[in-house]
């Protein structure tokens, strides 16, 4: 059961050269999943206008929700908001509410407004600035028809704060409620290749089910697997019931394998 498809666009050269680990994308993917959205792409692009424009256009064409991180600050390579306007085919304009937010942040610390700082208030006509409680650059919310696009800063604590305060309530309110449940089954002594038929069997139980094995030991010698079970449904009870049913069947099948040691968490 899903509310729609989502894309995550991560902007920044630092991500592509391996200097910064993309923890923002992992955090957002988990949030979106538990809100009922299937994340179909995580795209990382450099601080280059044409790359960012192409990513936004592609994402808006193929998904219901698009969330970008990075490129909203005052430096020359912070161009995500301007590139997004170009992707829409509109001129960027200074949003007065966003300008007020930025001005208050700087003036409260004794810093004057500059053209570079004013740039952080530029966004497409009709966009809504999202308050940044822990930083200076506001987020940007843009809706066109049933599409939702959100631009967030790249600093993790700023991104998380804006998402939880302003974005999560909006996404949660769209469509019917979706509930997730999960469980981990730990199995020792059975190679991953040997349990593939078992996983294939239990995944047929319900289309709302996702089962994935994660090797933690050595395939030959000391196999150790964590098998994650996820399910979504229209109620918490239904999701939990489905996971319980699948976990019990999985444990039963795994214990039939010689040498298997099985536990759940």
UniProtKB/Swiss-Prot annotation:
What CDD domains does this protein's entry cite? Answer: cinA
Domain of life from the UniProt record = Archaea
Which InterPro entries does the protein's record reference?
Answer: CinA, CinA_Arc, MoaB/Mog-like_dom_sf, MoaB/Mog_dom
- Which residues pair up as cystines? none
Matching PANTHER family, A to Z? NICOTINAMIDE-NUCLEOTIDE AMIDOHYDROLASE PNCC, NMN AMIDOHYDROLASE-LIKE PROTEIN YFAY
The UniProt family comment states:
Belongs to the CinA family.
State what protein this is by name. Protein Pars_0096
Q: Identify the species of origin.
A: Pyrobaculum arsenaticum (strain DSM 13514 / JCM 11321 / PZ6)
